Curated annotation (Swiss-Prot):
Entry protein name: Uncharacterized protein TP_0751
Pfam families found in the cross-reference section: Pallilysin (PF18663)
Keyword set, alphabetical order: Signal
Signal peptide start and end residues: 1-28
Top-rank taxon: Bacteria
Species, as recorded: Treponema pallidum (strain Nichols)
Positions with biased composition (Polar residues): 63-75
Annotated region (Disordered), positions in chain: 52-96
Length: 237
């Protein structure tokens, strides 16, 4: 085959290929092209978002501001954790009571309705004397009621006495304890705790040494309030 014939054949092939490409574009049949998937560009996986954020990601036009006439799309990553819109143009703040306070109020309500044991549960924790008795000096005594170990700890300055609860009896708003010293078992102490509220109690202690009751005013007698951590909890001497 001579060279002029090869040249004619090549020209015919090029013309046929050009005609094919022109025909494809004319009829809309564009040859396929590899397009990388959308996820490879860092698209946010909507399955990991809250439901309201998934709705925003699926329909971003729903978040357009139609009142002002502008179209603004909310970022779904911030929409899921955004606080609720304020009512009436002002931020609404609601102070929720601490969980422990709510539980104590519930216990107090149950106790006032006569539920046995509610007052003893309500006593658990640390209490500080607010009305200093004449025998306690300038130091505010502390009482710690430990229900888990059935112990009552009496503290004042460097003095700390731990008494084990032998028995407890509740009558109306008063809990009576019979206790004994963990170090010297012959030292017993009767304790009467009367509730004025779920945060205020009145305590009367009677010493019982070797079965001899000492009826004088005890340094532990007086009014106590529940101790809350913080500089404002402890009253000034």
């Amino acid at each position: 085959m001579n060279r002029p014939l090869l040249s004619v054949a090549g020209s015919l092939f090029v013309a046929a290929w050009a005609l094919y490409i022109f025909s494809c574009f004319q009829h809309g049949h564009v040859p396929p092209r590899r397009i990388p998937p959308h996820d490879t560009f860092g698209a946010l996986p909507t399955a990991a978002l809250p439901s309201n954020a998934r709705d925003t990601a699926a329909h971003p036009s729903d978040t357009a501001d139609n009142t002002s006439g502008s179209s603004t799309t909310t970022d779904p990553r911030s929409h899921g954790n955004a606080p609720p819109a304020p009512v009436g143009g002002a931020a609404q703040t609601h102070t929720q009571p601490p969980v422990q306070t709510a539980m104590r109020i519930a216990l107090w309500n149950r106790a006032t309705h006569g539920e046995q044991g509610a007052l003893q549960h309500l006593l658990a924790g640390l209490w500080i004397q607010t009305e200093i008795s004449p025998n306690s000096g300038d130091i505010h005594p502390l009482l710690f009621f430990d229900r888990e170990h059935a112990e009552i700890t009496f503290s004042r300055a460097s003095v700390q006495e731990i008494f084990l609860v032998d028995s407890a009896h509740t009558h109306r708003k008063t809990v009576s304890f019979l206790t004994r010293n963990t170090a010297i078992s012959s030292i017993r102490r009767r304790l009467e705790v009367t509730f004025e509220s779920h945060e205020v109690i009145h305590v009367r202690a009677v010493e019982d040494v070797a079965r001899l009751k000492i009826g004088s005013t005890s340094m532990w007698d007086g009014q106590y309030t529940r101790y809350h951590a913080g500089p404002a909890s402890a009253p000034s001497p």
